Curated annotation (Swiss-Prot):
Binding residues for Zn(2+): 100, 104, 110
Gene symbol of the encoding locus: ybeY
Biological role: Single strand-specific metallo-endoribonuclease involved in late-stage 70S ribosome quality control and in maturation of the 3' terminus of the 16S rRNA.
Organism for this UniProt entry: Helicobacter pylori (strain J99 / ATCC 700824) (Campylobacter pylori J99)
Cofactor(s) in the UniProt record: Zn(2+)
Entry protein name: Endoribonuclease YbeY
Entry GO CC: cytoplasm
Length: 141
């Protein structure tokens, strides 16, 4: 189940994200928080000691029954900027960031694993007919 806290002017029905959440964690609650660039910078600075806005952060919660899996926080203005720059829709960009964030909630870590997160992202991207994944875009730079 997906709970959405949209703190931005972005309007969407978020149906694609609900489908993705159902595939990845059908029995758990995932919180999606859409924030401004400045709010994301504050979160990143306060919680990770990184004084810049990033596109997506994930915050897993303890594995306690009947509690949310965790929160995925997405920087909506940066997602819009990247969607325009990369030539795909904002909905697709947010879906890519959401997949990336939820996989972190599920324990995947592309900085430490041996390609498992990249492989899982690839499977989901194909299943939902999405453009290039966040990990693959980052590796191309």
């Amino acid at each position: 189940m997906l709970e959405i806290d949209n703190q931005t002017p972005l309007e969407s029905d978020f149906l694609l994200l609900e489908k993705i959440a159902d595939v990845l964690a059908s029995t758990q609650i995932i919180e999606l928080v859409l924030v401004s660039d400045e709010t994301m910078r504050e979160i990143n600075r306060d919680l990770r000691d990184c004084d810049y806005a990033t596109d997506v952060l994930s915050f897993p919660l303890e594995a306690i029954p009947h509690t949310p899996l965790g929160s995925v926080v997405i920087n909506a203005p940066l997602a819009q900027e990247n969607a325009l720059k990369l030539g795909h829709s904002l909905e697709d960009e947010i879906a890519l960031l959401f997949i990336h964030g939820v996989l972190h909630l599920l324990g995947y870590d592309h900085e430490k694993d041996k390609g498992e997160q990249r492989q899982k992202e690839g499977e989901l991207i194909k299943a939902f007919d999405l453009p290039l994944s966040l990990i693959e875009r980052t590796q191309e730079c």
